[in-house]
């Protein structure tokens, strides 16, 4: 099936000023990126992904290919939520492939995915990274409005993230929601309506100190909102995964933002040390 939208983005590191930049970019159909900007002085470049069509319909296929070269850093966000409407013609699909070079960094924090009544959505993300690179992803799934006020009026949701490091799989996260099989109760959504997943795979950053700091953040946010949020942290090779359940996106964003603040603090120290080392040996 021909993609309804395509995006190819290649990010490289410029040694003269330490900035990351788009070495090449290509888009076609219903995908675009806004003009890049630099949110801080560490050289990371930020791109905003937009879908001028406003949402996904049945049969839509979107292909995204991102490569971050050695020493480069990219922040990728979206302009608005990913909205999945009725899909009688077949599922809406988004396929993303990411390649990270040595000491490369990708931070992907899109707006929530909203799946409306009668919608089916499949999302696959494959990350190929070096053991010296960093990958962060934070996603939230929100049920769309339904005329009968049910939280799970959509037909099906499947979000799969696969992370490969040096050719070895270090993470396979598989989120499947099929409301025909009751997902609201124990062992699935536990009575909550919104779910969040934050993945950080970052061998240069994720030592015991960082892991314990992240654990403390999760517990602190969890206990500050007893009854409004459930969350847990699992350690994986080179990093960790945080899964959250809540009644609204804001509670999940709260825990994501706290973890991302920790991550950015550690990243700044790491990239600063890398830069100092590079200057020392140049």
Curated annotation (Swiss-Prot):
Q: What Gene Ontology terms describe where this protein resides (cellular component)? A: cytoplasm
Alphabetical keyword list: Chaperone, Cytoplasm, Nickel insertion
Coiled coil residues, start to end? none
Domain of life, per lineage = Bacteria
Q: Where in the cell is it found?
A: Cytoplasm
InterPro entries, per database record: UreD
One GO MF term attached to the UniProt entry: nickel cation binding
Q: Which Pfam families match?
A: UreD
UniProt keyword Transferase, yes or no: no
State how it assembles: UreD, UreF and UreG form a complex that acts as a GTP-hydrolysis-dependent molecular chaperone, activating the urease apoprotein by helping to assemble the nickel containing metallocenter of UreC. The UreE protein probably delivers the nickel.
**General function of this protein:** Required for maturation of urease via the functional incorporation of the urease nickel metallocenter.
Q: State the family named in the UniProt similarity comment for this chain.
A: Belongs to the UreD family.
According to UniProt, the name of this protein is: Urease accessory protein UreD
């Amino acid at each position: 099936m021909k993609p309804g939208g395509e995006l190819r983005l290649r990010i490289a590191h410029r040694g003269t000023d330490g900035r990351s930049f788009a070495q090449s970019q290509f888009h076609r159909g219903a995908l675009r990126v806004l003009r890049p900007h630099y949110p801080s002085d560490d050289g990371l470049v930020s791109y905003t992904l937009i879908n001028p069509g406003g949402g996904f319909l049945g049969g839509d296929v979107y292909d995204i290919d991102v490569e971050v070269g050695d020493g480069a850093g990219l922040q990728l966000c979206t302009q608005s939520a990913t909205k999945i409407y009725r899909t009688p013609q077949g599922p809406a699909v988004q396929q993303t492939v990411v390649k990270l070079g040595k000491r490369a960094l990708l931070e992907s924090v899109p707006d929530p995915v909203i799946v409306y009544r009668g919608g089916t959505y499949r999302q696959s993300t494959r990350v190929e990274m070096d053991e010296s690179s960093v990958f962060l992803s934070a996603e939230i799934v929100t049920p769309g409005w339904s005329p009968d006020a049910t939280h799970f009026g959509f037909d099906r949701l499947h979000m799969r993230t696969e992370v490969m490091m040096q050719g070895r799989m270090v993470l396979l996260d598989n989120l499947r929601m099929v409301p025909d099989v009751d997902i609201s109760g124990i062992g699935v959504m536990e009575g909550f309506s919104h779910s969040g997943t934050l993945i950080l795979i970052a061998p240069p950053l994720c030592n015991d100190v960082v892991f314990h700091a992240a654990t403390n953040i999760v517990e602190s946010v969890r206990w500050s909102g007893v009854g409004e949020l459930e969350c847990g942290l699992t350690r994986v090779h080179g990093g960790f995964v945080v899964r959250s359940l809540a009644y609204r996106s804001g509670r999940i964003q709260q825990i994501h933002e706290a973890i991302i603040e920790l991550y950015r603090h550690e990243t700044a120290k790491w990239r600063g040390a890398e830069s100092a080392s590079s200057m020392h040996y140049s």
